[in-house]
Each structure stands twice: as structure tokens, then as C-alpha cells.
Design a protein with these regions (language model features):
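Internal helical hairpin/lid segments
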Residues: 249-266
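Charged catalytic carboxylate motif
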Residues: 130, 246, 250
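Active-site microenvironments that recognize anionic phosphate/pyrophosphate groups
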Residues: 1-161, 167-238, 242, 255-256, ...
Length: 353
């Protein structure tokens, strides 16, 4: 443990079959680079926000006066359901193929000032139930359904209203997980959860059904994996009522810890990975998969200093300064049952500015 805390080394990510350079000694360097405005919770949200209940969107469509979740087709989709076939390639270096799909927007709550950390467990449970319904609907037609949330302007979110996106298209590669299953006869992430529970070095949160860890191979400073403990669910549609309720609870607690770390509305990209879907899919057909969520937050030292994936990261391999163990310890030390907006004073709850 002392070695990985004090000396540079590389770590292997078996999910992506790639390596991450960890350079803990760089945590001591002074920062004189770009800073961001601290992401704050909205105390006075825009009354004309196009995602709020009853608002009119850019295309003239009016939202209903929804009181819980609300799903609608993305007004500016990246994927369309009807597209022509591309021309045949004239050289093997210039190959393209048809891409079909659909994009939806899902609002979590009618109030633009809300975030997951501020919502009630029952309100978050309604979000999870809608995710399951959307996966069941789109998964019957598409091989991959990607549910993801970009939170905060620093992550490219153009609207601060609590919402996510759902893109249905082709599925992501899963060869590494399949190869591990063929070699060991067990799902890679099932084994990984067992090992993290034994080592107890990177656990942030745990309840009766789920565990949150900073993965051993984390690329982003406070990246986390949200994993089920039992039952080996392959997709969100496999979750039991108890798993869904416990998921709502741990999501609220994790997001509260994130916000409390630097006393800000913590930005991130998050999303769900599960077994591919499609008309040919059926229960239990992808035993190498374990459904899980990934949180990828950019903040590094404070609410104003972010991690940039540039230069070496783009041209060679991912590099990080803070070790995953240090990040897990910092998050684990933050309160999960009380939000920073109910505290007084500034700075973060660990006394680090």
C-alpha cells in the first residue's frame, strides 16, 4: 500500500484491456492552470427552462404538467430510425455502415432546482422504474440501450434541469468480459466485487444490495462503480423490487457524498452498462455480464479545479495523480445522510480548500 501511495506505477483495466498511469507524487505540485466557476445548486432556477413542467421547447412542443418523470423524443437526436444505406466502400480503409437508432430525453423531476442528491428516495425510485420501462421498450428493438446523465456545464450539459438521455443503437464491445468468463467460468465483475469486499481498500458505500467502489483502474479522480452484491442481474430489467429500492437509497447517498466533498453541485457523466438487448435476447443469455453504473466526475482538487484528459492521455494512455485508494478514503469520509446545503461555512467537509 505504501508503494502505490508514494511511487508511480501502471494499473490494468480488464474491462477495457488498457493501462492507467498513476503518479501520486504529482499531488504535491502547485496548480496555476485553468479554474472553473464553482458549480452551485440553483436556488432560483430559470422560470423559462424548456425542460420544466408546462414549458415550451425550442421546437414548439409543450411539456405536460408532469409531477414525476417525463420522457420525450430528443428534439435534436444524434440517431434517427430511418436512414438510407451508405454507398459501398471503394477501399477497405474507407468503410462505413448504416447506423439506426433513436434518442430520448428523460426528466427526473418537475423542479429545475432538484438533483439526485436533493430528491427523496421515492422520487429516485420513480427514476429507476422509468429506466427499467425504457430499457424494456427500446431493448426489444435495439441491441444496445445507453442510459446516461451529463450533470453540470463542465460536462457539457446544456440544461441544468435534472434529466438524462437514452440512446438506443448498436451495443458496446464486451469481448474482455466474455474472454474472462470463458477462462474462469465466472463473470469478471462478480469476481471483482468479491475481491473488493475482501480487500476493503476502495469501498465508498455499501448497503444490503449494492456497493460503491472507486475502481482499482479508475481514470477520473473520483470515478466510482456502482455494483449489485447478489443475484447476478445482467440488465436493469432483472432487478428485484428490493434491489431497486436499495439502488435508490445508495444513489442518493453517493450523490450526497459527491456534493459534500467540495461543497458544490458535483458534476459528472454517469451511465449504465448491462447485457446487450434486441429481439433475440432473453433472460440469462449473457452470463459474463453484470449490470453496473459508472460515475465519471472531472473535479480534481476543489470545486474549481478539474482534471483535463489531454496531451498524454489522448496520445498515449490515461494518467491520474490521486490514487484510487486516496479518492475512496476521501469520499468515504464525507457524510451521506446530510447535504452540505444544510451546513454552515465554506470549503469542503474534510477541511481541504
Amino acid at each position: 500500500f505504501l508503494y502505490v501511495t508514494n511511487h508511480q506505477h501502471v494499473r490494468y483495466n480488464p474491462l477495457k484491456d488498457e493501462w492507467i498511469l498513476v503518479s501520486p507524487h504529482r499531488c504535491k505540485r502547485p496548480w496555476s492552470g485553468q479554474t472553473e466557476p464553482p458549480p452551485e445548486h440553483q436556488s432560483d432556477p430559470d422560470p423559462d427552462n424548456p425542460l420544466k413542467a408546462g414549458a415550451t421547447r425550442a421546437n414548439g412542443q409543450r411539456n405536460p404538467n408532469y409531477t414525476s418523470t417525463y420522457v420525450f423524443p430528443n428534439d435534436f437526436p444524434a440517431l434517427l430510425e430511418t436512414v438510407p444505406e451508405p454507398p459501398s466502400p471503394d477501399h477497405p480503409l474507407f468503410v462505413s455502415t448504416q447506423a439506426k437508432g433513436t434518442c430520448r430525453v428523460m426528466c427526473f423531476h418537475p423542479d429545475s432546482a432538484m438533483t439526485i442528491s436533493l430528491m427523496s428516495v421515492q422520487e429516485i425510485l420513480a427514476v429507476i422504474e422509468e429506466w427499467v420501462a425504457q430499457l424494456r421498450d427500446l431493448g426489444g428493438r435495439y441491441r444496445w440501450v445507453q442510459i446516461f446523465e451529463n450533470k453540470g456545464a463542465v460536462m457539457g450539459c446544456s440544461n441544468p434541469h435534472p434529466h438524462c438521455q437514452i440512446w438506443a443503437s448498436s451495443f458496446l464491445p464486451n469481448e474482455s468480459q466474455k474472454q474472462y468468463f470463458e477462462k474462469y467460468g465466472r463473470a469478471m465483475l462478480v469476481d471483482y466485487v468479491e475481491q473488493e469486499l475482501i480487500k476493503k481498500e476502495r469501498i465508498v458505500l455499501q448497503n444490503s444490495e449494492w456497493v460503491v467502489v472507486v475502481p482499482y483502474w479508475a481514470a477520473w479522480p473520483y470515478e466510482t462503480l456502482l455494483l449489485p452484491l447478489d443475484g447476478h442481474p445482467q440488465r436493469l430489467t432483472d432487478l428485484t423490487p428490493n434491489q431497486k429500492l436499495a439502488l435508490a437509497e445508495i444513489m442518493k447517498h453517493l450523490n450526497t457524498k459527491y456534493d459534500n466533498l467540495f461543497r458544490c453541485s458535483f458534476p459528472y457523466s454517469m451511465g449504465w452498462h448491462g447485457a446487450p438487448t434486441g429481439a433475440a435476447s432473453k433472460d440469462g443469455d449473457s452470463p459474463h455480464w453484470l449490470v453496473h453504473a459508472v460515475y465519471l466526475p472531472p473535479l480534481l482538487r476543489s470545486a474549481t479545479v478539474r482534471k483535463f484528459m489531454v496531451g498524454y492521455e489522448l496520445l498515449a494512455q490515461t494518467q491520474r495523480d490521486l490514487t484510487p485508494e486516496q479518492a475512496a478514503s476521501a469520499l468515504a469520509s464525507c457524510p451521506h445522510d446530510r447535504h452540505y446545503t444544510s451546513f454552515h461555512g465554506k470549503g469542503n467537509l474534510l477541511g481541504v480548500n
